[in-house]
Each structure stands twice: as structure tokens, then as C-alpha cells.
């Protein structure tokens, strides 16, 4: 069942069966990516493809994030593979729920709200037992690449194992204090540039600076001449995981046609290493970065996306400041624009 939400000229759709947001349009822009096989019958009927991959689109909430080697859930957990229950949906706001029986009947309530250029989400986690990883999973596609900007990070790291063996640009199992990752060929790659000219499947984790009160990622798309700003509460989501998917997956249903895709996966996890590893002492927890969320109490996870036209000449953000209902975006040149943003969302 598809639920439509509207505010002004903004339109979003929540797919209750897949748990994702396959449509978000605003001002003629479509910021989010939809997999090309999403409606192909042969993929939808394939029992070997996880539901989250069959209907891959937009943004969805992962709990647990990635591999669940504790409870045996499919990749990204029941929140991304099982139907949601609608609690209320009217106008610009929808509220939905999902229950996780294998985690002590933990309840996840999802709130989606459209306000102007923003798509706001809150996930309220209640009850349950044990520890769990989680992350948002918005995806954007770039026809001709783009430029990324980030809030201050104190580390960048890659997993010990590749997403798709032999197809990673970045060297494995590294930890750096800047945004320049070592590559397999001995060179370096600036994480602010999407590797559009490379057929790769890559993944890295960025760790938020300790004093950040607002975490953000900005994608400026070249061909599309727009920008997507993704905002998070860094206390709840201390890492941003970047998934680069650019034609390297040559097996069904991907078949080398998943190109130009960037996942901006803000959350609490140990990269792509699975729930069991995240629940143990690890290299992130050694940096005082939490990699799991303890169930059994109420947690509120706040996230937002803002879609804007790209101002002429802009190539990179140097700062994003939220104050009194206004987002101030500063470009590397010092130029600024002010964007209305709903007060109270990150309170």
C-alpha cells in the first residue's frame, strides 16, 4: 500500500510493504534514487533476493543495519523487509509502526513530515531487549557525478572486507584522520568527489567530531544542478557511512546497471561488519563512539533531508548553521543562503 503525503508543491510516497520512501519531489526536483528493477516481475518473484533489494528505493530505516548475525533477520532487518502498520496519515504527515519480535517486541514508530523543501523523519524506539545497530539509508543518483561536503569528522575508515570482492577502489581496513582514503593502487582519493569514472562497489565510515551539535552531508549533483542536504542528530547517530554503487555488482538483480548511486547512511553501527561485531569492543568503541543502541528504553532518532537548487558557482559547503528556524548554508567562497527550517525538529 502506498501512502501519499503533500505540502505545497512537495510530494512524498511511503511504501508500507517495503518500508521505504520511493518518491519525493519538490520544485521539480527528484532527489532520491529508485533501483531500475523495482517493478520487474522476475525480480519481485525471485526468492533469493531480499525484500529490501527487490524494492530498493529512496530512504528507509535499517534495524539492525547491514548483516544481522545475531537474530538471523535479512539484511537491514525487519524495518526494511516487513510491512509497516499505518497509525495515521493525513495531509503532510504520516505515522507508522513496526514491531521486532526477535528483539523482545521492540516497537519502532516512524513519523514522516513534509515542510517546504524539507522531508523530516523521527523514529521512536520503545521496549525490546538487547543491543541493536541502526541507520537511515537515503540514496541519491548522479548522472555525471557530484561533489560532497560534510560536517567536521575526526576519522574515516574502511571495513576489513570488501562489499564486492575485487571491486573496491579504496584500500581495506584503514583508519585516517582526514577525508583522503588510500586506494588499492597506491594513490589517494578525496572523499568529497564521487568516483564517477570508476566501476566500483565501495564503503567507508566517517566519524563525527566530538563537539558537533548538528551533523550534515551535502551532495551537489553536477548534471542535475541541485543539492541535497542530509541532517542528523550526531549524539544519536555518530557515524555517517557512505555506500558507493557504480556498476560493479554484475549479478542479479544488479546486472551492472546500478550506477552513480550514493548511500548516505547515518546511524550507529560498525560499518558493514554486522551486529555481533558491533556489540563487542571494537575500533569505534575504543574511540568512545557507540556502535549499538540498548533496547528497553525510549529513544528518539531525528533526521532530515533538504532539497535545493544549486546556486550558480557553488561547489562545496563549508558550514551549515541551524538557528531559530533558519538553516544558513555557507559556500567555500563565503557566499551564504538562508533556508527556512521547522523549529523544534532537532530539539
PLM regions: where:
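Asparagine-centered strand-capping/turn motif at beta-strand->loop junctions
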Residues: 124-128
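Surface-exposed acidic/polar loop and edge beta-strand patches at domain peripheries
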Residues: 1-120, 131-347
Amino acid at each position: 500500500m502506498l501512502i501519499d503525503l503533500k505540502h505545497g508543491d512537495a510530494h512524498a510516497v511511503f511504501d508500507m510493504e517495503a518500508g521505504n520512501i520511493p518518491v519525493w519531489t519538490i520544485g521539480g526536483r527528484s532527489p532520491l534514487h529508485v533501483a531500475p528493477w523495482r517493478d520487474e516481475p522476475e525480480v519481485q518473484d525471485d526468492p533469493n533476493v531480499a525484500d529490501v533489494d527487490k524494492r530498493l528505493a529512496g530512504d528507509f530505516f535499517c534495524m539492525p543495519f547491514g548483516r544481522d548475525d545475531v537474530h538471523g533477520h535479512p539484511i537491514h532487518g525487519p524495518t526494511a523487509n516487513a510491512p509497516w502498520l499505518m497509525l495515521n496519515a493525513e495531509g503532510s504527515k504520516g505515522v507508522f509502526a513496526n514491531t521486532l519480535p526477535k528483539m523482545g517486541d521492540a516497537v519502532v514508530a516512524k513519523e514522516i513530515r513534509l515542510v517546504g523543501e524539507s522531508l523530516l523523519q523521527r523514529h521512536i524506539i520503545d521496549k525490546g531487549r538487547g543491543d541493536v545497530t541502526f541507520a537511515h539509508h537515503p540514496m541519491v543518483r548522479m548522472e555525471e557525478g557530484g561533489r560532497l561536503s560534510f560536517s567536521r569528522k575526526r576519522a574515516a575508515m574502511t571495513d576489513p572486507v570488501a562489499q564486492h570482492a575485487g571491486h573496491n577502489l579504496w584500500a581495506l581496513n584503514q583508519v585516517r584522520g582526514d577525508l583522503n582514503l588510500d586506494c588499492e593502487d597506491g594513490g589517494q582519493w578525496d572523499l568529497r568527489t564521487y568516483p564517477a569514472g570508476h566501476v566500483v562497489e565501495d564503503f567507508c565510515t566517517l566519524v563525527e567530531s566530538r563537539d558537533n551539535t548538528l551533523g550534515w552531508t551535502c551532495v551537489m549533483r553536477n548534471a542535475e544542478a541541485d543539492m541535497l542536504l542530509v541532517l542528523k542528530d550526531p549524539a544519536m547517530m555518530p557515524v555517517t557511512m557512505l555506500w558507493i554503487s557504480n556498476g560493479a555488482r554484475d549479478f542479479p538483480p544488479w546486472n551492472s546497471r546500478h550506477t552513480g548511486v550514493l548511500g548516505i547512511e547515518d546511524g550507529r553501527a560498525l560499518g558493514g561488519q554486522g551486529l555481533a561485531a558491533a556489540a563487542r569492543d571494537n575500533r569505534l568503541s575504543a574511540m568512545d563512539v557507540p556502535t549499538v543502541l540498548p533496547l528497553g528504553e525510549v529513544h528518539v532518532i531525528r533526521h532530515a533531508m533538504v532539497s535545493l537548487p544549486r546556486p550558480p558557482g557553488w561547489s562545496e559547503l563549508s558550514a551549515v548553521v541551524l538557528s531559530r528556524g533558519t538553516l544558513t548554508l555557507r559556500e567555500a567562497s563565503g557566499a551564504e543562503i538562508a533556508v527556512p527550517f521547522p523549529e523544534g525538529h532537532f530539539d
